[in-house]
Amino acid sequence: MEIRYATNPRDFKNYDNERVREDFLINNLFEKGNINMVYSHYDRLIVGGAVPTNSPLHLEDKETLKTEYFLERREVGFFNISNNKGKITVDGEVYELDHRDCLYVGKENKNILIESIDSDNPARFYIVSATAHKNYPTQKKSLQEATHRHLGDDSQSNKRDLYQYIHADGIQSCQLMMGMTFLSENNMWNTMPPHIHDRRMEAYLYFDIDEDEKIMHFMGQPNDTRNIVVSNEQAVLSPPWSIHSGVGTKNYTFIWAMAGENYTFDDMDHVVKNQLK
């Protein structure tokens, strides 16, 4: 597991493009036959990807976590971002995940196996884990069951549908919040005007992006912003002090995940567009 350390916003002002990408962009998450993970010191969030093929993949990393099993002091959310079915076995109980299904697994579940139904057409699982203080029940939720919010409009090029899966009024968790947002056709902006939530960090996974299309992800303090050019199935870590917004060369989908102090989705400090530099 790769480890990423936290960054002071004063130091961030001196980063060149290469350093920004090294610290905040996550690529190569989805590798056939493997689980790849990044441990962030922002709220101890783990971001990962799994593409099981011929044999199940076991969610574990004793060396990094120094625990007997992965969820000894953690909770985790899985999303199947592929069109291929997969399944996750939690201490012997099997959960089948179709396209855009989410599975939450709580603290103290010991044996987590990740599999594809068809090894020739493997599922692609996005994984996010946060620290946990108590056990919440394992629960699966489909896109149709998620809480739906319609946001934006065509005039601002930010018309989008946001689906909340793991949150206060959905799947219960200690601190992990996860959901998925779809940009409508001919709409390319997400989270503009932007906001900051100093109580929580956030991670974005951008996907459903054609090979020759890109996302410009904006980050930094409102008066000192930078951009990261993002390709399909790459993730970005967003510090609590940073805005997080993006625009694509075409519409796209992203999964957002948050962890931190407050468990309220709307706890955010809005930034006026005129403040941006």
Swiss-Prot record:
Cofactor note: Binds 1 zinc ion per subunit.
Pfam families for this protein: KduI (PF04962)
CDD domains reported in the protein's UniProt record: cupin_KduI_C, cupin_KduI_N
Pathway the protein contributes to: Glycan metabolism; pectin degradation; 2-dehydro-3-deoxy-D-gluconate from pectin: step 4/5
EC class of the enzyme, as a word: isomerase
InterPro entries: KduI, KduI/IolB_isomerase, KduI_N, RmlC-like_jellyroll, RmlC_Cupin_sf
Name by which UniProt lists this protein: 4-deoxy-L-threo-5-hexosulose-uronate ketol-isomerase
Species in which this protein is naturally found: Oceanobacillus iheyensis (strain DSM 14371 / CIP 107618 / JCM 11309 / KCTC 3954 / HTE831)
